[in-house]
A protein has these predicted regions:
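Cleavable N-terminal export/targeting peptides
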Residues: 1-29
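Subset of outer-membrane beta-barrel
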Residues: 18-326
């Protein structure tokens, strides 16, 4: 047990002792926002939670333990400042996973309506132009496979796009051209999961948004590269009897992001008869977020989940997810 927990203890100790603040170091920050409601209720501590298509957004290795032919999930996330994130994931396990699990992920972002302006020789120094609608999109293809009863690996390649409207650029004193502000990037995610024999304790790691530097206009920037290491265990497995119809899952993730100081996510999920679920989480070392709450239910192949995250000076974030597995 000590050899399994030691990496987590070392990582958390490093996080608590870190004083180097990293802020605003990356672009395409929408890739760091998680929309799944189950994960939202558990403070996004999902590195070692496996068996669903949403693993594509956390750790692609999690798909490898899928027991159904396919799993599909749609999530709607009412983010801060009127920004809306919609996510879709699909994973297919042909021939009972003999050939691994194949996955597809989509992430769409609507930044809402913004007022365009342009430089002008008047008292204000600018003129209002037409309104514009910034957006972002990411499409990914993933693969996960269980190499043994305990060890799983997975990866994903994805293409991300961001549209920030257009602007008028003077060419000469009498002529101008319109330029669309569009940028794109190719990124990779990969990870591993290892399941132990000790009460089903699971630990794993993932690397998300690994890519080359991306160019926008004249400046280059990096994507929000994030390294995660985490563990999870059913706390009720320590009770010898009476826990067959219920579970209390505890999960912890330690994050090393390029854009922010190191962070820790803690999550709990209580399940009764694999039908009703209650969730609670805590986000450590975040400026505006702390506790997270969630609930859900599952009837046959259908599951519905909801999560609420208070966001300090902003309105609370609401997420809802609908999943189907067969």
């Amino acid at each position: 047990m000590i050899k399994y927990l030691l990496p987590l203890v070392i990582t958390i100790s490093m996080i608590q002792g870190s004083e180097n603040k990293k802020l605003a170091q990356t672009g395409f920050q929408f890739l760091s926002v998680m929309s799944d409601a189950r994960s939202g209720g558990m403070a996004d501590a999902m590195t070692t939670i496996h068996g669903k298509s949403v693993s594509l957004f956390f750790n692609p290795a999690g798909m490898s333990r899928q027991t159904q032919l396919f799993d599909m999930n749609f999530s709607a996330n009412s983010w801060i400042a009127g920004i809306k994130h919609d996510a879709f994931s699909l994973s297919v396990s042909p021939n009972n996973g003999q050939f691994g699990v194949f996955g597809l992920s989509l992430l769409n972002v609507d930044y809402g309506e913004l007022q365009g302006t342009m430089v002008w020789d008047n008292d204000q120094g600018y003129l209002d132009t037409e309104k514009f609608y910034p957006s972002a999109l990411a499409i990914g293809l993933g693969y996960g496979r269980a190499l043994s009863e305990s060890f799983s690996v997975g990866g994903q390649v994805k293409k991300a796009y961001q549209y920030l409207g257009h602007n008028v650029v003077p060419v000469t004193d009498s002529s101008k051209v319109v330029e669309n502000n569009i940028s794109d990037a190719l990124a990779f995610d990969f990870g591993t999961i290892f399941m132990t024999d000790w009460h089903g304790f699971t630990f794993g790691m993932s690397v998300r948004n690994f890519s080359d530097e991306t160019q926008y206009a004249y400046d280059g920037f990096q994507l929000p590269l994030t390294f995660r290491i985490g563990g999870s265990i059913d706390l009720l497995s320590f009770i010898p009897t009476g826990s067959e119809k219920q579970s209390l899952l505890f999960a912890i993730d330690a994050l090393h992001p390029r854009s922010y100081p190191e962070r820790v996510n803690l999550g709990f999920e209580y399940s009764f008869m694999s039908i009703g679920y209650m969730r609670l989480g805590y986000l450590y070392n975040y400026d505006e977020r702390g506790l997270t709450y969630g609930a859900g239910f599952k009837i046959g192949p259908l599951s519905i989940d909801y999560a609420l995250t208070p966001f300090g000076v902003f309105d609370s974030v609401n997420r809802i997810s609908i999943g189907i597995s067969r």
